Every structure is written in structure tokens, then in C-alpha cells.
Amino acid sequence: MEPQLNQEVINTAALHDGPIETDAVIVGAGPVGLFQVFELGLLEIKAHIIDSLAYPGGQPIELYPDKPIYDIPAIPVCTGKELTDNLMKQIEPFGPTFHLGQEVSVLEKQEDGRFFVETSKGTKFLTKTIFIAAGVGAFQPKLLRVDGLDKFDNSQLFYRVKNPADFAGKNLIIVGGGDSALDWALNFVAEGPNKAESVILIHRRDGFKAAPANVAKMKELCDAYEMQFIIGQVTGYDEKEGRLTAAKVTGADGITRVVPLDVMLVFFGLSPKLGPIAHWGLDIERKQIKVDTEKFSTNIPGIFAVGDINTYPGKKKLILSGFHECALAAFGAAPFIFPDKKIHLQYTTTSPKLHKVLGVESPVFD
């Protein structure tokens, strides 16, 4: 479920003839990457954001868009989608430019101290600073390995649900044993506009890594013949006239059953990969970037790392910790962008300058 996007904010940059010259490039559009835009914006530093996903929000949007989050200060509870929507609204005044569905493939230090950055789609930048907010790396879905099945990708085989309405009235096979598989199985069985014609859940064993209440609900629905659960693994498929018509499911008994379908949804989880980041010359420890906690700078001057991607003594992988890191990283980066300017700490409650930057009126006190 993708976040609500303001087109002016989310407008992905058009192709440029030459590199885009900018003060800051943020790698990662999860909550911490989005809040980095805000902290930089308060210091009048404009940013471009790159993310491998086709939409902002990172892990909360990809893994738990509808799950409640309880540990964001002053927000008793919100979902991953609500958190993303609120962050997108918060950064609107700073007009960041998003470059989505692409990864950084090249990073080179230039003689003038700037960095040359190129993405997998050929977008090029010359930037004074880089903020790596890539979480645990670029997310790639874990694939169902059946020879030839990949030719049905994004037509009848899907690894995520963008629009539930696309699957309404269909005969669905859902493969997996985690929260996503159970959540979507229950979603498509439920009465409503997205109800499927039939739902068959396939998992290799009877145990699940999912919320016990959802597992119990699934078994209730099976007992009521409203859906089916088959223990086994997809080992093959049938097709007719270029269309996927059935999955071959082999059980622990060695018997292979042919299960008709319209669409197959696979939820094996997402595999985070550091990708090219691992080859940028950064000091990496157990797939995390080492930083100092004064500025959250890396061993390469001008490159900062915030959020789950970094490590330091006492590190806790919490969204609120990442927000704190963004503030210090922004102040740490300011001298690279404004070498002759003294940066003063100002407060959004009282600073007319920050009110102007934020596009709000300064309060008048009697």
C-alpha cells in the first residue's frame, strides 16, 4: 500500500544533459532519509533523494504499511503508511527531488572535493555531500525458484500487492508463511470490493512466522471452506497459450498436486543487499557503516550515514534514533556546503528565519 503523494513533492527529476549539481544527495527514502530532508532544509540545504523502490517510505511501507508503530515520540500510534504520509507533508516546504526505482551504481570523489554519483538509470550528480540512509540496504524480493516461471512476472506472478483491486474476483494462490502471506490471504477472503473468487494458501510446513491471531483466523476460514491451505512447495506449473493456468505443488508425501489459478502471489520476504555501497571504500563492519557520533560522518569526509545502515557503540536500530542522527549529520555537513558561514542553532518555535523557510507565519505574542 503506497503512501499518499503530493505530485509537486514526489515529482521525479527529468533526464538532464549533464550532471545535476546539488549540495546534498540522500541515498534512501525511508523515514530517516525523509527526515534528513527536513533537517537539511532547516539549514537551507536542498537535497535530491535516490531510492531503489518505486515510492518513498522504505521498510515501513514495504514490510508493514498497515501495522501499528507505537514508539514515535508524541504519536501514540500510527501505521507505516501514516508515518510516511506525515513525513512527506513535513518536507513539502523544502521541495526535495526524488529519483525512484534506481540505485547508486557509481560514486567517485572529484578533485574539487565534490562527489560524482551515477544511478542504475543513468542519472548523474555532482554533490558536495552524501547522506546514506539506506536502512539495511536495497530491498529485493526473495524469488520463487521454478525454471521458466519468471516469464509470468508482473502479469500473473507477483511479489507484492500494489493495488488489491487488481486481484478481486480472481482465483489466487498465495505462497508463503509469514505475516504478508497471511495478511493478504485474509484480506482477499474477506467480504468487500477486493474479495477474490478463491484463495489457496501454500506453505512448506504447518508452522508459520506470523501473528498467532491471523494463523488461527486462517484455520477457521479453512474449516468453514472459505479458503484452503495446502502444505507443500511449488515445484512446477502448467500453461496454456502463454497463460499460467496451474501450479504443481509437491507435498511432504512426495505427491504432486495440480492447483488451478489465475494469479500467484509469493511472499518469501525481502532480502536486503548492501549492493554497490560495499565497494565505496567506507569502513564497514558486519554490513553496517561505522560512524562517529558527533556528526555521523564516515571515514570519507563529506559522506554521512544515518539510520539502520550505520553502527557505533550503543547503536539501537530505532526510527527515533535515526531522527536524532539526522539533526547532527545536517549540522556536520553544513561546513562542506557553507565553508565561510557560521551555523547557529535556531528553534522552530521562535526563529523568524525558520518560519520563513517553513512557509509559516511567525507568531505574535502580547
Curated annotation (Swiss-Prot):
Keywords: FAD, Flavoprotein, NADP, Oxidoreductase. It comes from the Bacteria. It catalyses: 2 reduced [2Fe-2S]-[ferredoxin] + NADP(+) + H(+) = 2 oxidized [2Fe-2S]-[ferredoxin] + NADPH. Its EC number is 1.18.1.2. Its cofactor is FAD. InterPro entries: FAD/NAD-bd_sf (IPR036188), FAD/NAD-binding_dom (IPR023753), Fd--NADP_Rdtase_type_2 (IPR022890), Ferredoxin-NADP_redctase_2 (IPR050097). GO terms for molecular function: ferredoxin-NADP+ reductase activity; flavin adenine dinucleotide binding; NADP binding. The keyword NADP applies. FAD binds at residues 51, 59, 64, 104, 139, 308, 349. Binds 1 FAD per subunit. Belongs to the ferredoxin--NADP reductase type 2 family. HAMAP family: FENR2 (MF_01685). Homodimer. This is Ferredoxin--NADP reductase. It comes from Polaromonas naphthalenivorans (strain CJ2). The lineage of its organism: Bacteria, Pseudomonadati, Pseudomonadota, Betaproteobacteria, Burkholderiales.
